[in-house]
Amino acid sequence: MSTQTVALDIMGGDIGPSETVPAAVQALSLLPQLKLILVGDQHQTTPLLQQHGLLNHPRVRFVHASQVVGMGDKPIVALRTLKDSSMRVVLNLVKAGEADACVSAGNTGALMAMAKCVLKSLPGVDRPALIKALPTLSGKRTVMLDLGANVSCDADTLLQFAVMGAVVAEKVEGIAAPRVALLNVGEEEIKGNDLVRHSAELLRQCQALNFVGFVEGDRIFSGECDVIVCDGFVGNVALKTAEGVVRMMAQLAGYPRKKRSFLGRIAGFMFKRRFSYLNPDQYNGASLLGLRGIVVKSHGRAERRALCNAILLAAQEAKHQLPLQIADRLESVFSDRDL
């Protein structure tokens, strides 16, 4: 059985070691082939590591980092001045081949800037993209990109995103011939701006893609397509809107019992059970695609269960050697296109 080594930034995020360390314990218990390199401040975390039995764990190694990237730090400042931060060190471990993947719940902008600087882009990749799996009514998952790495794109970049997203759907989600769609304001070919219509032509001409046309925002979670492609501005707005709706629904289901009728309490209980699959913890972890290494961004406010899922995602991508798969597919698609 092959092993996957994941470097975990235990200092990152709004909560930090009090959640990342227990998440590491959970991930190790769920995945026997997983090895972890925990990166953080040794003096601050040693008592916590000892408490959770990780100091002498056979599948755990600790690497000290003297700095931490704050959630409010500007990316350019973090890139230039925080070279011994836990975030930077996990990326260095991936670059050096000591880790197969890395996970951080830290500052998103800083992570993207550092990842591009340390790991570099794959050959032919203009811009890396953030991708995330989302739940659908079909019970399967849809992957969506870009979710905020690039606020503006051209048609060629969206084509690259589509190819990379299709590889993720195939290798990580196990979907044969994934259906690829562009997010648009309508399903008709005449709908959308010039960028979306031009991108649709490129995707339609790409024989390596199973392009099914446009999908509207209200169908993102329908399960009608397996890969949804958009620029980072649109994708981030769509994702944050969906997260807000889920939070609102959860709060309504948890409305104070004393203020609800008997039937209201029953309805709230049934709602929680029926829609438990919508729990964002199950889908935590957005991957930065198009780099020469695997980088998974956990939500900054993620707790241990969610962080554990981000670690498992990183290990799964490492198992499938995702960057190599993407590089091979891009070379095949774009070499044929240039002929």
UniProtKB/Swiss-Prot annotation:
One of its GO terms (cellular component) is cytoplasm. Its EC number is 2.3.1.274. One of its GO terms (molecular function) is phosphate:acyl-[acyl carrier protein] acyltransferase activity. The keyword DNA damage does not apply. It is found in: Cytoplasm. The keyword Protein transport does not apply. Disulfide bonds: none annotated. Pathway: Lipid metabolism; phospholipid metabolism. Pfam families: FA_synthesis (PF02504). It catalyses: a fatty acyl-[ACP] + phosphate = an acyl phosphate + holo-[ACP]. NCBIfam families: plsX. Homodimer. Probably interacts with PlsY. HAMAP family: PlsX. Belongs to the PlsX family. Catalyzes the reversible formation of acyl-phosphate (acyl-PO(4)) from acyl-[acyl-carrier-protein] (acyl-ACP). This enzyme utilizes acyl-ACP as fatty acyl donor, but not acyl-CoA. This is Phosphate acyltransferase. The gene is plsX.
